[in-house]
């Protein structure tokens, strides 16, 4: 009955709807969110385990996603309730509480989940303090636990004072997801740059090319992937650093596959002027409808980030359309 696994299932349903347009997803999620609104007052997000309240931003994000489709007012009421039961990320990020300055204070993946919550909530609160909270947090983290990959030292709890500490694979893919949702909500290019940093530095090296194995923890500038003792908070019989399926803890095997597909889904965005915007660069093709129903195919050809040029090709389905502005 834990709320947290249901949040994962809702993310899967969202992906299914985006790929197929299956209206059963909308009906199911609407019914589930009515159930949640009725039951959360007595059994809040943290009733069964702490995961739900730390990761409530995922729940909130999905509620607002459905609201943007159906416009049903009860979803806003539910969003207010979920936010009130979720870990208070905005005060934490602004330094009102000391978790970001305290050794072993936060589970590394919970921080990746929670990083987006203030920006998701900002869509409702319109409070600049919420919008800016992750920026304040990252400025703090860069000088304490931050790594060049755009992530942080956490194996599995936050670690200060040593850049060779581990960083969990789940942190990478969940931080990418958070950044992608933050870009959609805010349009802030800082988070697009941050997404590229994680996607092109942390993710490629932490799984095999065939995706039949992964590390649990990655270390910056590590010189060996070996089964031996390292000063991790949770060493898991010293298997965290090698490549495999069940080494470390199995969660990363379940989670690693969302990294690249969701990254590809977030290469192109709709813009306010009814056009399209490429916030993140990668070889890609997008079939889009813009302006007054104009159909177009956009292609990015690039070797970025190893090359500094991106060639964008625009093809229109109707030959009468001859103009495009950049």
What are these regions (language model features)?
Residues 1-326:
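Glycan-recognition and catalytic cores of secretory/periplasmic carbohydrate-active enzymes
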